[in-house]
């Protein structure tokens, strides 16, 4: 999938902190940063009420805004790859991290909440990631 840094975000302060950390690390290492948002999760009525097209559009807008905000905060950016994917967050993050050097997650946001299968997304990623996992406090 990629040979750089993968960061999972979902629009919270912890996700923004993880993105900023990943972007700084990407600039230090000279590596691309893949910013991943799992859309279409059954976490609330607002998501269930959206069509797939609306959910993907909202996810893409959120990704663009998060990267722009992090770029301002960090003062630059490495090569950025944005991925908005439909499905279970842990599964998506683990797939994206297959060839990654690092997987970066924020603590205190949805990645720490119980996923559809009843397990913490961050715990699932720590247990099964093919690369080191960095958990950034939010």
Where do the model's predicted regions map?
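Small/aliphatic-rich secondary-structure junction motif
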Residues: 2-49
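Structural motif
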Residues: 4, 101-102
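General small-molecule cofactor/ligand-binding pocket signal
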Residues: 34-36, 81-85, 134-136
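Short secondary-structure boundary segments
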Residues: 37, 106-108, 137-138
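A short acidic, glycine-rich active-site loop
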Residues: 51-62
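Short helix-capping segments at alpha-helix termini
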Residues: 70-77
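Charged docking surfaces used in two-component/phosphorelay signaling
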Residues: 84-92
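Glycine-rich, Arg-bearing micro-motifs that act as flexible, cationic patches
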Residues: 102-128
């Amino acid at each position: 999938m990629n040979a750089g840094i993968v960061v999972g975000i979902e629009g919270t302060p912890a996700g923004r902190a993880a993105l900023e950390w990943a972007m700084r690390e990407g600039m230090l290492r000279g590596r691309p940063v893949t910013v991943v948002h799992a859309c279409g999760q059954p976490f609330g009525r607002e998501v269930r009420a959206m069509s797939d097209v609306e959910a993907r559009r909202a996810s893409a807008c959120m990704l663009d805004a998060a990267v722009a905000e992090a770029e301002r905060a960090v003062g630059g950016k490495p090569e950025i790859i944005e991925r908005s994917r439909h499905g279970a967050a842990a599964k998506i993050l683990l797939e994206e991290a297959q060839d990654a050097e690092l997987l970066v997650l924020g603590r205190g946001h949805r990645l720490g909440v119980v996923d559809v299968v009843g397990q913490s997304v961050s715990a699932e990623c720590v247990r099964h990631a093919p690369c080191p996992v960095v958990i950034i406090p939010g």
